[in-house]
């Protein structure tokens, strides 16, 4: 008797779950973005958001072991950020790259592995690096822009002092550290759900 092929088509219930958990992710990431008022926290913000959002992302991966989760979550979150005026072309680029890579990892691992869903979450979390990334990408023009927008001189000066290569490395590492903490925190709190889904 041939093995039954699992149904990987998203149902109405799946889409509702994706919508709900995407909204929760947006709220948590939006709260994290307020950390940008403190320069050093803006640098590590992608990692902090990963810690905060590990539960909704990983629980959604448990509930919907099908393709489309990172892409749809990224699309919904991106639209919400666009509506609130918080979206830039850099964030758009990092979000798209992070979502696509996350989707590929889940697809290659057949959706049911905690380890690979954690990797997918880390890649997804790199989408938020688009917020502090202009500090290094555009540097002088970026600092001129935020000064023209009315940011205090002390804030701009502090940001300039943080725009070093070592701090860039720190920023790049934060989604990995935060993603691991967020994923294991989610599994620790909702162990029964992960065990039932075979993600232990």
Provide a role label for each language-model segment.
Residues 15-19, 47-48, 70-75, 89-96, ...:
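Hydrophobic alpha-helical transmembrane segments
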Residues 118-191:
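Membrane-embedded alpha-helical hairpins and interfacial helices in multi-pass inner-membrane proteins
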């Amino acid at each position: 008797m041939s093995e039954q092929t699992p149904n990987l088509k998203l149902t109405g219930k799946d889409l509702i779950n994706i919508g709900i958990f995407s909204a929760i992710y947006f709220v948590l990431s939006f709260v994290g973005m307020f950390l940008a008022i403190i320069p050093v926290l803006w640098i590590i913000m992608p990692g902090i958001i990963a810690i905060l959002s590990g539960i909704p992302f990983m629980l959604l991966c448990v509930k919907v072991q099908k393709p489309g989760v990172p892409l749809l979550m990224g699309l919904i979150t991106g639209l919400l950020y666009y509506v609130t005026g918080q979206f830039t072309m850099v964030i758009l680029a990092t979000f798209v790259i992070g979502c696509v890579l996350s989707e590929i990892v889940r697809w290659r691992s057949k959706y049911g592995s905690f380890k690979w869903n954690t990797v997918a979450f880390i890649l997804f979390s790199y989408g938020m690096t688009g917020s502090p990334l202009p500090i290094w990408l555009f540097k002088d023009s970026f600092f001129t822009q935020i000064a023209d927008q009315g940011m205090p001189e002390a804030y701009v000066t502090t940001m300039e002092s943080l725009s070093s290569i070592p701090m860039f490395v720190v920023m790049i590492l934060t989604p990995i550290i935060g993603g691991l903490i967020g994923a294991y925190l989610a599994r620790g709190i909702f162990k029964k759900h992960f065990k039932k889904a075979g993600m232990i």
